[in-house]
Amino acid sequence: MRAVVQRVKGASVKVDGDLISSVGPGLCVLVGIHKSDTKKDIDWLVNKLLTLKLFGDEGGKRWSKNVVDSGHEILCVSQFTLYYSLKGTKLDFHNAMPATQSQPFYEEFLSS
């Protein structure tokens, strides 16, 4: 699995103008799933996202709290393009998990 993690003051996902999901302060995470990923990869990434110390404390000390300690939220967005490779002038996505497998895998990731 691959993740692009960004601290945000707020983030949202809209499709055709309709709000799908939103969060206040916290993290926005783009998640790519490799064709060979397993439950072990889900567990590792979930643990990493929940324990990364990316936020400051009340005393101003930077990088001292994780998303759970600071009471923030996480917005996850599935992004198969994180597993592209460049073949000449074309993008190749053969390393990304196929949609039929990745949807239940992603849902398992979200519920973890």
At which residue positions do the language-model features occur?
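A charged helix-plus-loop insertion that forms the helical arch/lid used to bind
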Residues: 87-101
